Amino acid sequence: MKTKKSYDKVTRWVTPPILMLIIIHIITGACSSNAYPIFAQKSYENPREATGRIVCANCHLAKKSVEVEVPQSVLPNSVFEAVVKIPYDTQIKQVLANGKKGGLNVGAVLILPEGFELAPPERISPEIKEKMGTLNFQNYSPSKKNIIVIGPIPGQKYQEILFPILSPDPANKKEIHFQKYPIYVGGNRGRGQIYPNGSKSNNTVYNASVTGRISQILRKEKGGYEVTIENISQGRSVIDIIPPGPELLVSEGEFVKADQPLTNNPNVGGFGQINAEIVLQDPSRIQGLLGFLASVVLAQIFLVLKKKQFEKVQLAEMEF
């Protein structure tokens, strides 16, 4: 009989930078337990696809919620807070790259309108700095300062991430206008299920590659399993490799069908995205509005005074 091992490999055409990132991810998985934003930065020029989908969802297959808080409107050349919330139960543990259990990390991507960018340190107030803590933000790329990423960072401490944002000034940038703009947000908790090269992580379910009977389950010395499936119709046996982490659901002698789960799905995290809107407000419009409101108030005051004066005249005429 022929023996075939069906497992995921990093193919030869993978570029050295991506290969290095994957190696780093495996080595440091115990402490950095969710996918790195740099994976998306290296693989995609823009993190938001034409369909509106943020590319982080290509590796983080489970859908989870995310929230964002931004002001309804901001003035030009001003610093404001954009708060991304990534809620999850901090009591749960996830499978790390070494197969052990550990806490979840979180990460986020904030896609701002053109012209909006991360506020420089000298423009950030002490109050905002105190709220931010020691967070380290970075631009998605040198040419995309309006896209900001962060992570992985400890989810236990940072379920709320405060981004200090500087609004643009149309007086200095002619392509910027006073209007309503969209903001796109992605937030993740936990590790991904797929690496950028398409191979599986150990944070996902593993299925049978063929239909047949399980003839042997070999527990590997460093964790994980080799599951041998006898495929009678094809006259061969196939060995499915299961890395440390997922829990085995099958036993020797059991008959399985192709694509039937051999393990549980250990993933407890997921990715979510949400949209928001913000208005870049013209200061002159605010001044005009204040002037209008002041005129309305004055008109009301004069109307009340006039009414009282008229009542006094009527009262005097009645007494006369």
From Swiss-Prot:
Note accompanying the cofactor annotation: Binds 1 heme group covalently.
GO molecular function terms noted in the UniProt entry: electron transfer activity; heme binding; iron ion binding
Residues spanning the membrane: 286-306
GO biological process terms on file: photosynthesis
Keyword terms of this UniProt record: Chloroplast, Electron transport, Heme, Iron, Membrane, Metal-binding, Photosynthesis, Plastid, Signal, Thylakoid, Transmembrane, Transmembrane helix, Transport
Listed cofactors: heme
Source taxon at top rank: Eukaryota
Protein localization: Plastid, Chloroplast thylakoid membrane
Kinase as UniProt keyword: no
Family indicated by similarity: Belongs to the cytochrome f family.
UniProt key word Transport: yes
Signal peptide: 1-32
Membrane topology term: Single-pass membrane protein
Coiled-coil segments: none
GO cellular component terms listed in the entry, alphabetical order: chloroplast thylakoid membrane
Protein task: Component of the cytochrome b6-f complex, which mediates electron transfer between photosystem II (PSII) and photosystem I (PSI), cyclic electron flow around PSI, and state transitions.
SUBUNIT field: The 4 large subunits of the cytochrome b6-f complex are cytochrome b6, subunit IV (17 kDa polypeptide, petD), cytochrome f and the Rieske protein, while the 4 small subunits are PetG, PetL, PetM and PetN. The complex functions as a dimer.
Protein's UniProt name: Cytochrome f
